[in-house]
Amino acid sequence: RSGRVERSRITKSILVIDEAQDLGEQEFALVKELIRCNEDMRVMAVGDDDQNIYEFRGSDSGNMKTMITEYGASVYNMLENFRSSQAVISLANAYVKGISGRLKSGPIVGKRSDPGHVRLVRHFTPDYEQAIVNEIVSDRSPGNVCVLTATNDDALVISALLNKSGRKARLIQSREGFQLSDLAEFRSFIDAVLEYNCACLDDVMWAEATDAVRRRFSDSGCLDLLENCLAAFNEEYPTRKYFTDFENFLLESQIEDFTRSKESEVVVSTIHKAKGCEYDNVYISLKGLHNVTDKERRMVYVGMTRAKNNLSVHFDNADIFTDEV
């Protein structure tokens, strides 16, 4: 707006906004300015206001509503769900009705025929982590397992109890400010690629850079992480490999995306850190959730919809679930 940015750098024909429900005040101001500077620009915003759980960072799903009202945007409801079983979808649909001011006009439609299983367990004492652990230890359902919690403290307690019970737990901890390119193995691969001074790498260059890192870090515990990352990138970009695409791929990825846990290992995480993930069997602990507003309801909804097959929700506050749910 001040004219300090060259016009050529802000001239755009198409703008795609992913996770639009997470737009904050500054990001939305940028979007509005780009629209002002490009009268014929097409804008596509993809988001789910039911999954806005980053209000503490300044995100506001109201910006999506503003795009509809101020710019006359067309709204397309994408209601098909290919992840979750019928039982999980039914619970999520019933629960999300309690959130006010929603944009979606209809229920989610499950596309899987699997019935799945849902269990709601109300506890009358606040210390029920051991009950969750006992259920996990005795459960023989196939597939991977994840425990999602409302707080970091609860995640630590459940992780410790699982390990004490003999069931190995992997605690997902916050890595704010951490990037995959900070790891020596990734940095070495990037340096090897940059030596070619080529925007688009052919298969030979890519293989040579990969082999160089393998030789240098043959004993590294993070080499598998790099290998998994490169395999995922190859799958997404099977023909042309541009360095800028790889840079963006790293920026958009998390270390958990390339960590292949064993099925016997239980992943323990807060709900906020698990957004975007999915697991066959999900246990949710809502300990400490007492003041239930729309913000908390959205968090619970995100936790529920991480489950693919089976879901078990443990809580001690009767206000979390209505009689209808």
Each language-model region and where it sits:
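Conserved helix/coil segment N-terminal to the catalytic DExD/H
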Residues: 1-10
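Glycine-rich phosphate-binding loop signature in dinucleotide/nucleotide-binding domains
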Residues: 9-10, 38-39, 138-143
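Nucleotide donor/acceptor-binding cores
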Residues: 13, 116, 143, 309
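Conserved helicase motor core of SF1/SF2 NTP-dependent helicases
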Residues: 14, 21-113, 146-164, 172-180, ...
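Core RecA-like ATPase module of SF1/SF2 helicases and allied nucleic-acid translocases
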Residues: 86, 146-299, 304-312, 317
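Short, charged/polar "capping" segments at the starts of alpha-helices
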Residues: 103-104, 319-324
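Conserved interdomain hinge at the start of the Helicase C-terminal
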Residues: 123-142
